[in-house]
Swiss-Prot record:
<dbReference type="GO" id="GO:0070296">
    <property type="term" value="P:sarcoplasmic reticulum calcium ion transport"/>
</dbReference>
<dbReference type="GO" id="GO:0005789">
    <property type="term" value="C:endoplasmic reticulum membrane"/>
</dbReference>
<dbReference type="Pfam" id="PF05366">
    <property type="entry name" value="Sarcolipin"/>
</dbReference>
<dbReference type="GO" id="GO:0016529">
    <property type="term" value="C:sarcoplasmic reticulum"/>
</dbReference>
<comment type="function">
    <text>Reversibly inhibits the activity of ATP2A1/SERCA1 and ATP2A2/SERCA2 in sarcoplasmic reticulum by decreasing the apparent affinity of the ATPase for Ca(2+). Also inhibits the activity of ATP2A3/SERCA3. Modulates calcium re-uptake during muscle relaxation and plays an important role in calcium homeostasis in muscle. Required for muscle-based, non-shivering thermogenesis.</text>
</comment>
<protein>
    <recommendedName>
        <fullName>Sarcolipin</fullName>
    </recommendedName>
</protein>
<dbReference type="InterPro" id="IPR008028">
    <property type="entry name" value="Sarcolipin"/>
</dbReference>
<feature type="topological domain" description="Lumenal">
    <location>
        <begin position="27"/>
        <end position="31"/>
    </location>
</feature>
<comment type="subunit">
    <text>Homooligomer. Can also form heterooligomers with other sarcoplasmic/endoplasmic reticulum calcium ATPase (SERCA) regulators ARLN, ERLN, PLN and STRIT1/DWORF. Monomer. Interacts with calcium ATPase ATP2A1/SERCA1. Interacts as a monomer with ATP2A2/SERCA2; the interaction decreases ATP2A2 Ca(2+) affinity. Interacts with VMP1; VMP1 competes with PLN and SLN to prevent them from forming an inhibitory complex with ATP2A2.</text>
</comment>
<keyword id="KW-0256">Endoplasmic reticulum</keyword>
<comment type="similarity">
    <text>Belongs to the sarcolipin family.</text>
</comment>
<keyword id="KW-0703">Sarcoplasmic reticulum</keyword>
<keyword id="KW-0812">Transmembrane</keyword>
<keyword id="KW-0472">Membrane</keyword>
<feature type="transmembrane region" description="Helical">
    <location>
        <begin position="8"/>
        <end position="26"/>
    </location>
</feature>
<dbReference type="GO" id="GO:1901894">
    <property type="term" value="P:regulation of ATPase-coupled calcium transmembrane transporter activity"/>
</dbReference>
<dbReference type="GO" id="GO:0033017">
    <property type="term" value="C:sarcoplasmic reticulum membrane"/>
</dbReference>
Length: 31
């Protein structure tokens, strides 16, 4: 259970960082 939760948390963090980076790139590109 803990491993599952940890994996899910890591995946969520990676996705969040990726989305944030893409958003910053798009924003700086448009700006």
């Amino acid at each position: 259970m803990e491993r599952s939760t940890q994996e899910l948390f890591i995946n969520f963090t990676v996705v969040l960082i990726t989305v944030l980076l893409m958003w910053l790139l798009v924003r700086s590109y448009q700006y």
